Amino acid sequence: MLYPAIEQVKELFENYKTVPVFYELLMDSCTPIQLFNCLHEAYDDCFILESVDNKDQWGRYSYVGIDPKCEYILDKHVVTVKEKGKADESVKVDDPIAFFSEIIEGHKSPRFNNYPKLTGGLIGFFAYDMIRYFEKTLCNPPEDDLKLPDADLHLFEKIVAYDHLSNKAVIILNINKSDDLETKYKESEKICNEVVETLRNYKPVMKTPKTMEDNITVKSNITKEHYLANVEKAKEYIKEGDIFQIVPSQRFEIDNPPDSFDVYRMLRSTNPSPYLYYFKHNDYAVAGASPEMLVSVENRTVVTRPIAGTIKRGATYDEDIRNEQQLLNDPKERAEHTMLVDLGRNDIGKVSEFGSVTVTDMMIVERYSKVMHLVSNVKGTLREDKKPLDALMAVLPAGTLSGAPKVRAMEIIDELETTKRGLYGGTVGYLAFDGSLDTCIAIRTVLFKNNKAYIQAGGGVVADSVPENEYQESCNKAMAVINAIKEASKL
């Protein structure tokens, strides 16, 4: 039986344009990975979003989106709209914030207590380069060799949420005010029955692990000497007063990588993170395990959580405590973190009510499976004349992936780096029908395209940075993801 009943849906249409309906079934013999595999076999263009908090506890829900209604691909001020059964449509867009916000507002929906938060919305990515739509001085990007769009978002009205608390699957469908309610409600019941049959008939196939040699070759898009020279050049700009901090990077690639979803499975196993995501669309796939929120908006509260400062976990409890104190007392890490908190306050302040921006946590230590980070929490109240996407674009890209001052740092990054960043340093997440937004920074992320896997990583450079150390930091950050690819090749 669907919830809410058809009579309640009708009442809700007095205030909302879209109403989600829910169907629950027990799935205690199924994992989220099996759920995704089952649905991915039956439906095109699925995604999975999951979360593990810093106490290594799974977030309550894993979300699998199925059968998107349409896709919006933004590139060079043109949105290509792809919808099943229709010819592609191209729309010239001067203001992408207004374009995508209008879609969400056209699906305004209520929030139901005791049901999954994400019931439908736009899910996908915005590239690092989105800022070029609003900062006209950033007009000389490096070579765009990967040819990714500036944004790729799918409109999902069908989601299956796996409840880790009750071991139930919650099938979520959306009914629009413009639909014939009685017809659509019956159709929703039919779709739920079809999804239930698909799930019940699924027979997972156990793979036999491969006993193969580790033959994965990794290469960078620049030499070590080039990276060291970039750090030295960045320090010159800092010395001259152009910037205080900057985040140069390098991009690694692997030919003939293993299956992209197997890589996701290894990432969630070896790097459990607050933001875990996988999607495969058109000619590319993305698998990520990001530790860092970019921005979230809920009930007009805007939050960003800068992470800057990292040290490895200790092998013992005592070593872990020593490492924590070393991180907290490192003057370079503290100075860099403070700069990025100030940048976050400035970014949030652009869209928040005057006087509402506060730092609710300052330089606390959060522990993850292999490292611990310095993290701060910056909050504000979204102004009445601003939309959640305004908050996203005020922060994108994060200062932790660009530098401070942000625009000047990005101009220098364009000068130093040989290829356009694209997904790296951009954001992955969702814009929900209820008006909430939750996005992370696209780091610890693999892009699969052209039969290659691409992993990009960098590190913050300040006045006293040691080039060799910065090079090693970028390699170490990438290695966590590269190791997951190596392990996935054995599945």
Q: Predicted regions: what is each one?
A:
Residues 1-491:
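Extended alpha-helical targeting/anchoring segments
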